[in-house]
Amino acid sequence: MTNQAAEVAKRRTFAIISHPDAGKTTITEKLLLMGKAIAVAGTVKSRKSDRHATSDWMEMEKQRGISITTSVMQFPYREHMINLLDTPGHEDFSEDTYRTLTAVDSALMVLDGGKGVEPRTIALMDVCRLRDTPIVSFINKLDRDIRDPIELLDEIEAVLKIKAAPITWPIGCYRDFKGVYHLTGDYIVVYTPGHGHERTEAKIIQNLDSDEARAHLGDQYDSFVEQLELVQGACHEFNQDEFINGQLTPVFFGTALGNFGVDHVLDAVVDWAPRPLGRVAHERTVEPVEEKFTGFVFKIQANMDPKHRDRIAFMRICSGKYEKGMKMRHVRLNKDLRIGDALTFFSSEREQLEEAFAGDIIGLHNHGTIQIGDTFTEGEALGFTGIPHFAPELFRRVRLKDPLKSKQLRQGLQQLAEEGATQVFFPERSNDIILGAVGVLQFDVVASRLKEEYKVECAYEPITVWSARWISCDDKKKLEEFQTKAMENLAIDGGGHLTYLAPTRVNLALMEERWPDIKFRATREHH
């Protein structure tokens, strides 16, 4: 095996998906603790104080104590290199969160054991399904009251349409939480409270049918054995092929706050989740062990560093090897550049990078020329697919406070749209500017960045738009006829693409029925 192939085999690139407050920030900290990337985990409560959680950037995040921006953390674990892509976890996350899922090879789904499957989890799973991403599941908060575990597994299967295969099973919960039983390994991992902030070796009891296990479970022993028989009879067994194809998820139980069960999940990512996979481009499929470098940009982040008013383009490496000072081609602009200063991330601590391999995420300094979806190669003209725009779910009309600044407004919005901070639509019938977003917070972010970076103040007004659909049609005459009839609701987006802004769900359904030859798409590929 060549050095490059060995490096690729060591890589695991994944993201965490969860509903706000399911415990994602805490589990991120504990994963970093496992990888010895941080010496001691700060509890979530300290997030709003001076000790920001390691993945909180930008002024507004500091004020709100939330992580708006998707950051990347790399750490070693069991002779593997883990790339963890953090996704904004609060109620108002953005399209960035969806796009981050296009840059990973697997995902970790964190569920609150007291609440089960929640709306954001469903939305994120829909995005994972676009690429059949393998999912590992962690049912969190066992140190509190949780719902019946069998009921939780049924809900995962019914709502998320994926088979659930429990690997560990909880012994009690809240004050009676005694640990988890490993279903295939036949051993108990004992839970001892109070070790949330450090790395500790958990005590193991071999064999459920042992005096030690009986003593540990006490009064719970008989009912637990009975429950296990039911579980083993009713639940799916783990199957590697079904997992890799995104049809089955292994399920683990634990408490991230108590730092218990998190290592089981990380072991599953190392043992079962795929190494970096081949990536489809318009021209061909690119394999990770190919010698030549390729990569694509899935996110652009502004002002990570308040001292430097720069923007960083996050690039997922698909093949080859990045070396400091190498030359690469920016395919869309057909321009060669020498990259001497790519960054690797341990959250906000930026470090200069000497080399990186397929599966790794690197940061390129961007002075406004790089866009989301851009491909970089060592010369070959390639364009990777599968980095879409997602139809916004919320819309606002922009009103400028100073009418003389309309040029700055357009310039600012164009740039923010290229970064993926928002989507911009220019209606065919008016001079309005409409912004689209996936989460309410994106509007606040855009307004504060327009003010700080472009010295433009704007306000928002409500507008009757339910959703946007990108329009295409193979029949030019039909398209022209549609454009004439639907002019009222048509707009051009920031990339120059024809878009239908549907005022209601019913309206969209009617239009799709009335115009069968017109394609109304909920996603649009970049470029």
Swiss-Prot record:
Q: Key word Nucleotidyltransferase present in the record?
A: no
**GO terms under biological process:** regulation of translational termination
Q: Which domain of life is it from?
A: Bacteria
Q: Where in the cell is it found?
A: Cytoplasm
- Binding sites annotated in the UniProt record for GTP: 18-25, 86-90, 140-143
Q: Where is the tr-type G domain?
A: 9-277
Q: Which GO terms describe its cellular component?
A: cytosol
Transmembrane stretches in the record are none
- Give GO terms: molecular function aspect only: GTP binding; GTPase activity; guanosine tetraphosphate binding; translation release factor activity, codon nonspecific; translation release factor activity, codon specific
Query: Which keywords fit this entry according to its UniProt record?
Result: Cytoplasm, GTP-binding, Nucleotide-binding, Protein biosynthesis
Q: Which InterPro entries match?
A: EF-G-like_DII, EFG_III/V, G_TR_CS, P-loop_NTPase, PrfC, RF3_C, RF3_dom_3_sf, RF3_GTP-bd
Family (UniProt): Belongs to the TRAFAC class translation factor GTPase superfamily. Classic translation factor GTPase family. PrfC subfamily.
The entry's function note states:
Increases the formation of ribosomal termination complexes and stimulates activities of RF-1 and RF-2. It binds guanine nucleotides and has strong preference for UGA stop codons. It may interact directly with the ribosome. The stimulation of RF-1 and RF-2 is significantly reduced by GTP and GDP, but not by GMP.
Checking PANTHER family in the record gives: PEPTIDE CHAIN RELEASE FACTOR RF3
Record's protein name? Peptide chain release factor 3
Species: Pseudomonas putida (strain GB-1)
